[in-house]
């Protein structure tokens, strides 16, 4: 009776084709590997060669055989002591092997081989990524064991072998879920930097700073957040070590020389929880570019509909990203009434404070050609070296010294970071957009900041006593000749080679240009220096203005009064600075503070005889 049961059960049971089984799983593995192979070539185009498919498939097949053999050996070794062959499995596999190979084996050998094939099939299915095929194989085993009289024992025997598969599939689903969560939607910027936590300097050996290499990623997150800043340590790590939402950043600024005396290209991030990160870039351009990008993502101004609200928010952000300019803070503390500037075809309303320098505000971009045409139609710029008496020369120099701040492309003591933000507002589309500002580090010099293919470049300008402009190895008779030249000829970059960068347009300084009127020596006396009229240009206070004499005098009187050192209201000689140069930030700060207190003290000897410290080499910095 016991011997007849297996034979009667084996007759109706369908015998699966092992070749079809192998072909099915081979197709699944091949399709999965082909998809991943194509994705790999898209991510790494250097491997995209005509024979890449052959090389990859051969390597895949060789490794597949090695891993397959090892996995079979491992599964058989772990399951040999726990699993015993069932009579039904023995009979079915015996019929399968007899029909396939035609060998005559004993029932014990066939049962052992059937258990091996069962484990091999399960082990092979675990290597595939398709869960539907795994479920299909499971249904196949259930159908084979269903005709057995004691079929309740067969599923129990198959459970220990299916548990590892279920655990593996659960891990596979979990890994896919995590990968979907960390998928990036919009990467703003990515680069390799070095960073340290501010507290690590004291905790390191001997109080030294603990710098770490990282991959800094500025991205937009998935779940409705705006932006995040992530530190990947080491740079090749797949998950960030530190992840900071930009809404938690309260301050972004470049470091001062006293803070990091041994490092030049560093900036600071301060977070709401009190953490402070110091990051180091390769050069100064990357430093200011990172600061500008982070600030732009912290509070993008284009999301504000109300201009007044945008200006107010920009004022808060300007205090966060304050540069090392002491004049910036002093001037920001002085309240100024808002003014409305009406230009040709454009109306811009903004307060006079430094909050206008934020990227979010809509600043007018004026074509340089329009300015040059206006300049030519007005007869050009008056020469400063006309013959005349000394008093007339001094008055002409004083008038010319105010001219640079009167032009719309000059932004006074605008910081390097804010200048970069202005020219980078349109990204690569604003190629050729420029501003001219006063140098933060070299008194008496100016800097041409322009947009070069979406990156901010800073070119130093030097103005001599005759108004001539020196840019790298080129000399120009005036700043206007320099603008006219670089409007039609490419700017020679320090990196060499041909660069298609010409000055196309400029960011117009927000402030009404002064109305043409009498020269400063014929203006009505004002009570103190640096007290400007209501309609004066915003940046005119950044140039050097002198107090008019107490009583009107002619040119000779002006000459004699300029030679007298006892008069506090006389015009001080400035042999070391040109008529078109802008003065240092520290000097202008002193005058601002004096104006606030209402004092009119005599200029010190150091102020009168300030000389240029270094003969400049004109390059990007």
UniProtKB/Swiss-Prot annotation:
Sites of Phosphotyrosine modification: 47, 618
Residue span(s) of domain SH2: 409-507
Phosphoserine PTM positions: 130, 303, 597
Compartment(s): Cytoplasm; Cell membrane
InterPro entries per UniProt: PH-like_dom_sf (IPR011993), PH_domain (IPR001849), Phe_ZIP (IPR015012), Phe_ZIP_sf (IPR036290), SH2 (IPR000980), SH2_dom_sf (IPR036860), SH2B (IPR030523), SH2B2_SH2 (IPR035058)
Pfam families, A to Z: PH, Phe_ZIP, SH2
CDD domains, per database record: PH_SH2B_family (cd01231), SH2_SH2B2 (cd10411)
Superkingdom: Eukaryota
TM region positions: none
Keywords assigned: Cell membrane, Cytoplasm, Membrane, Phosphoprotein, SH2 domain
Tissue distribution: Strongly expressed in brain; also expressed in spleen, kidney and skeletal muscle, and at low levels in small intestine and bone marrow. Strongly expressed in B-cell lines, but not T-cell lines. Also expressed in myeloid and fibroblast cell lines.
The keyword Phosphoprotein is annotated on this UniProt entry: yes
Region named Disordered: 143-166, 507-528, 549-611
Low complexity bias spans: 552-571
Family: Belongs to the SH2B adapter family.
Subunit-level organization: Homodimer. Interacts with KIT/c-KIT, SHC1, EPOR, PDGFR, VAV1 and VAV3. Interacts (via N-terminal region) with SHC1. Interacts (via the phosphorylated C-terminus) with GRB2. Interacts (via its SH2 domain) with EPOR, INSR and KIT. Interacts with GRB2 after B-cell antigen receptor stimulation. Interacts (via PH domain) with VAV3. Interacts with NTRK1, NTRK2 and NTRK3 (phosphorylated); after stimulation of the receptor by its extracellular ligand and subsequent autophosphorylation of the receptor. Binds INSR, GRB2, ASB6 and CAP. Insulin stimulation leads to dissociation of CAP.
PANTHER family with a match to the protein in the record: SH2B ADAPTER PROTEIN, SH2B ADAPTER PROTEIN 2
Protein role: Adapter protein for several members of the tyrosine kinase receptor family. Involved in multiple signaling pathways. May be involved in coupling from immunoreceptor to Ras signaling. Acts as a negative regulator of cytokine signaling in collaboration with CBL. Binds to EPOR and suppresses EPO-induced STAT5 activation, possibly through a masking effect on STAT5 docking sites in EPOR. Suppresses PDGF-induced mitogenesis. May induce cytoskeletal reorganization via interaction with VAV3.
Protein name, UniProt field: SH2B adapter protein 2
Organism classification: Eukaryota, Metazoa, Chordata, Craniata, Vertebrata
Encoding gene per record: Sh2b2
